């Protein structure tokens, strides 16, 4: 007797190898992707030369002791502390410079620059005008190849030589956050860059400008003001350090071009994908960073590196040093050192080219890029043109290759796919090939599993739409398990009813066709809109194309359809009875050692072998119940595992098409490895990145349905590489996925959506009508939770609460009479003083505005004005301060407290009623009882609530006017 285990094939297309190998590959890739996404690489135990991590951490703790928005006294304290730290580092450098020839360091405390510009609005609406006075700190480290002299002291001075490098970080925080990651880590990183590039061995070849800008949180004011500083003429490239989350890894948000991105790609732990840049470009991400000014206004070339999650801590009291880590500091710092070092050491002329339009700098022209990281350890960077060329090549070559292969198969008479019958050339008799069996199985499996997965998105949105806010992985698990289980279940039912050896080939063919259409759309967007996020489709399609081609190549190993028809005809002639199917051998009867009774094995001999009294009467008969499927299939695999030839198709040739006995049993593993790994790496990263960027936008009024649909679609795309093989899975993993589905579905439908680590953000503002004494405190948040929060505040009567959702972008504003704030000593009517006067021609109105204990006021107009001018202000033709639809609001910022602004306003001809409000703002909440209503909310609001600011001021005091 021949051993039953002889010739076992561990990669045969049988249930256990398929289940185990595919599961191992998925786990081996998904687990590292999740780990890399959430765990920050550890900081070195000993600080590298040129930096001091312990010092950096102490600086971060000092910087984040208080809220320090621009309109606060603590902001002045931070400003003075930064100057002290910068000068201390510079003094060490100066002493070293005298003895070792170190670089010169120049510190500019910018207390003179101002600018009038517009900060928001589009052509179809009135815009917001801004007047801002700078409190920026600019540090220039002269490069070893920079021209000597102090050209900036001359009013018309211009830099010579190659352009320098700018590193920017804003040091103001919001009024409700300590600013540890937004943007304390960026500030501390910039301080350490000053130390690093003034340390021997690290001196920059090109000049380095470090900008500590103030006023970013109030619509990028500090970056706009930098446009008026002399150093803005010198810097051609930039690195912007920012924070839109609270901890984790620093992400490459955006980059202007391929060439600049390559410098970041050399960092030790690059992290990011071009998807973020495209999201900004398409308007899916509306918040902006200083990158917008440096790129869009100045025409500089550079990068935007920022923290991105969790957004529930962003702009709240949990954006503090306790909720970040030295590892996060090092991740940003190490990337900044590598990127900046590459830029200041670059000697080419790539960033010194022709002048841009609109007075932009001479920065040359870059190429749009594509980038994505691999497990946070390397960065793939290439041009969008390369991606476009590859896309076009695949769109043409891949279908052509399949067509030529199909023609060749027809030519050699081996095209079993798409063929129901063949005809004997001798007699013209018809022989069934069953080549269409399983042809429409894949769209059925894909359609039903996708529909059920998407249906869950609708269900969650209907019952518990905010569950993703705190439990994104519960949502992912639910979607993945739904798709996985139902795809397997439908596949098994179809395979039980109509087994087909062509399931793999047809599945890949359908995938090929669907992805080809997706690639056409992606290619159009690449060319016409510069959208590069479709890179995963290109690689997905490439893998599927080769896998599909392999399925076609497998058919060359079969006999011709004519030879098969002749054998079947001879068999039919010898056994004309209705029981002729008994002549088909069972799996046990196939030889295990390549021979039968001492002679060479030939499948034709087996087919012609007569049944005997010892032949099983049940072999080859169709299964009749699904209950018998598992045992029949398990017995079948057990028998097949004992066969001697690894090239024979593993299933009983009666259960699938008889000609399939010659199909290569191991080809499936090559197909799987061509598709699954690259899909998991690219889509896994994209899925987690999208989740991190969007899963908490619901608190800001964003559509959560898009998030659920996105996860559902990504779940299908991630599992799609399994679909050609999933009918071979054992029941164990799908059954486990069913339990996961049930558990996560119940949890997602019933669990409370917020937690201590994922608090719901609501925005606060208190509005004082100084003319009438009306005092309204307000919270803005999402329904129905905003009403529960307001009702939890003591001394607020239900009949006094008024709520409206108009004009708040999916959120609701609930207001009630609040406790009087004490942001100013004295009667509230004295908080704001103003005077309005008309010119003789009645074309211009002059406003004189001042507020006590503040340096921020604004003018609001019920009808847009055509123009305005702030006395003593500078205007820049690169940055228009008015628009075709006029100006509806003028914001006034001063570096001095209780300043008086003089503003001349020109009215449009349509301004029949000249009405509006004169308003001043107060943003300092570092002491108790300054804003007692806010103190009350913080004390009595539910534990799952976080307070953030609604607008620039926590308290707004205003007078109405009518001319």
Swiss-Prot record:
List residues binding Zn(2+) 2: 182, 217, 315
Q: Which residues lie on this side of the membrane: Vacuolar?
A: 37-391, 463-473, 526-535, 690-705, 754-963
Composition-biased stretches (Acidic residues):
603-612
The active site lies at: 216 (proton acceptor)
Per the record, the domain of life is Eukaryota
GO molecular function per UniProt: metal ion binding; metalloexopeptidase activity
Q: Which residues bind Zn(2+) 1?
A: 170, 182, 242
The coenzyme or cofactor needed here is:
Zn(2+)
- Region Disordered: which residues? 569-618
Q: Which PANTHER family does the record match to this protein?
A: METALLOPEPTIDASE M28 FAMILY MEMBER, VACUOLAR MEMBRANE PROTEASE
User: What is this protein identified as?
Assistant: Vacuolar membrane protease
């Amino acid at each position: 007797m021949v051993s039953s285990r002889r010739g076992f094939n561990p990669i045969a297309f049988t249930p256990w190898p398929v289940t185990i190998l595919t599961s191992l590959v998925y786990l081996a890739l998904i687990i590292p992707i999740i780990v890399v996404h959430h765990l920050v690489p550890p900081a070195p135990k000993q600080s590298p030369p040129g930096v001091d991590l312990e010092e950096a951490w102490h600086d971060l703790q000092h910087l984040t002791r208080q809220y320090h928005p621009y309109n606060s006294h603590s902001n002045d304290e931070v400003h003075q502390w930064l100057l002290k730290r910068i000068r201390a580092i510079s003094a060490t450098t100066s002493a070293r410079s005298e003895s070792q020839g170190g670089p010169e360091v120049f510190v500019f405390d910018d207390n003179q620059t101002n600018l009038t510009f517009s900060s928001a609005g589009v052509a179809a609406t009135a815009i917001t005008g801004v007047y801002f006075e700078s409190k920026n700190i600019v540090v220039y480290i002269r490069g070893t190849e920079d021209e000597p002299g102090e050209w900036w002291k001359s009013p018309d001075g211009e830099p010579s030589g190659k352009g320098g490098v700018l590193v920017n970080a804003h040091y103001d925080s919001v009024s409700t956050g300590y600013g540890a990651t937004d943007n304390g880590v960026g500030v501390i990183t910039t301080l350490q860059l000053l130390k690093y590039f003034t340390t021997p061995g690290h001196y920059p070849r090109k000049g380095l400008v470090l900008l500590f800008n103030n006023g970013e949180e109030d619509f990028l004011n500090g970056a706009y003001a930098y446009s008026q500083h002399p150093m803005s003429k010198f810097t051609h490239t930039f690195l912007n350090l920012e924070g839109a989350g609270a901890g984790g890894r620093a992400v490459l948000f955006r980059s202007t071009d391929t060439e600049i991105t390559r410098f970041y790609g050399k960092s030790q732990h690059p992290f990011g994908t071009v998807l973020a840049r495209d999201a900004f470009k398409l308007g899916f991400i509306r918040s902006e960073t200083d990158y917008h000014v440096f790129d869009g206004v100045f025409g500089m070339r550079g990068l935007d590196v920022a923290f991105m999650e969790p957004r529930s801590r962003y702009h709240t009291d949990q954006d503090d040093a306790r909720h970040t880590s030295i590892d996060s500091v090092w991740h940003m710092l190490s990337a900044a050192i590598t990127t900046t070092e590459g830029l200041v050491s670059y000697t080419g002329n790539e960033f010194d080219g022709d002048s841009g339009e609109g007075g932009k700098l001479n920065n040359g022209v870059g190429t749009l890029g594509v980038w994505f990281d691999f497990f946070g350890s390397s960065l793939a960077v290439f041009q969008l043109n390369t991606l476009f060329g590859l896309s076009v090549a695949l769109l043409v070559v891949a279908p052509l290759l399949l067509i030529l292969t199909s023609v060749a198969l027809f030519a050699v008479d081996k095209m079993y796919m798409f063929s129901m019958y063949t005809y004997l050339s001798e007699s013209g008799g018809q022989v069934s090939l069953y080549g269409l069996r399983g042809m429409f199985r894949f769209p059925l499996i894909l359609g039903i599993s996708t529909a059920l997965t998407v249906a869950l998105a609708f269900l969650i949105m209907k019952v518990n739409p905010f569950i993703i806010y705190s439990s994104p992985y519960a949502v992912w698990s639910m979607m993945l398990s739904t798709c996985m289980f139902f795809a397997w279940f439908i596949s098994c039912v179809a395979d039980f009813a109509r087994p087909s050896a062509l399931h793999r080939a047809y599945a890949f063919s359908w995938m090929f066709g669907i992805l080809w259409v997706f690639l056409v759309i992606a290619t159009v967007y690449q060319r016409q809109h510069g959208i590069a996020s479709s890179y995963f489709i290109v690689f997905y399609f490439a893998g599927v194309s080769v896998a599909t081609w392999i399925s076609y190549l497998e058919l060359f190993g079969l006999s011709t359809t004519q030879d098969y028809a002749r054998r079947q005809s001879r068999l039919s002639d010898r056994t004309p009875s209705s029981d002729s199917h008994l002549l088909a051998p069972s799996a046990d009867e196939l030889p295990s050692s390549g021979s039968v009774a001492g002679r060479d094995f030939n499948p034709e001999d087996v087919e012609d072998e007569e049944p005997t009294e010892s032949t099983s009467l049940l072999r080859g008969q169709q299964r009749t119940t699904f209950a018998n499927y598992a045992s029949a299939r398990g017995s079948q695999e057990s028998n097949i595992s004992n066969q001697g030839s690894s090239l024979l198709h593993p299933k009983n040739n009666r259960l699938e098409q008889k000609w399939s006995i010659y199909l290569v049993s191991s080809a499936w593993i090559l197909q799987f490895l061509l598709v699954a790994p690259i899909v998991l790496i690219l889509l896994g990263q994209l899925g987690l990145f999208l989740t991190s960027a969007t899963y908490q936008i619901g608190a800001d009024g964003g559509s959560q349905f898009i998030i659920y649909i996105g996860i559902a679609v990504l779940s299908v795309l991630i599992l799609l590489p399994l679909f050609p093989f999933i009918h071979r899975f054992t029941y164990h993993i799908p059954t486990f996925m069913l339990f996961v589905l049930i558990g996560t579905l119940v949890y997602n439908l019933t669990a409370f959506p917020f937690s201590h680590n994922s608090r719901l953000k609501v925005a606060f503002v208190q509005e004082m009508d100084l003319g009438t004494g009306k005092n309204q405190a307000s919270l803005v948040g999402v329904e129905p939770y905003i009403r529960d929060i307001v009702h939890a505040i003591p001394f607020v009567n239900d009949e006094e609460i008024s709520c409206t959702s108009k004009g708040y972008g999916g959120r609701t504003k609930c207001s009630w009479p609040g406790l009087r704030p004490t942001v100013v000593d004295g009667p509230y009517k004295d908080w704001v003083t103003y005077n309005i006067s008309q010119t003789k021609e009645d074309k211009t109105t002059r406003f004189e505005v001042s507020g006590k204990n503040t340096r921020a006021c604004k003018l609001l107009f019920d009808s847009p004005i055509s123009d305005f001018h702030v006395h003593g202000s500078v205007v820049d033709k690169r940055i228009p301060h008015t628009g075709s639809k006029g100006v509806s609001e003028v914001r006034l910022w001063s570096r001095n407290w209780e300043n008086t602004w003089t503003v001349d306003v020109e009215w449009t001809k349509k301004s029949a009623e000249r009405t509006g409000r004169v308003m001043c703002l107060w943003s300092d909440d570092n002491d108790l009882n300054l804003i007692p209503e806010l103190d009350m909310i913080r004390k009595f609001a539910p534990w799952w609530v976080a307070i953030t600011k609604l607008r620039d001021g926590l308290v707004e005091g205003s007078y109405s006017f009518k001319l």
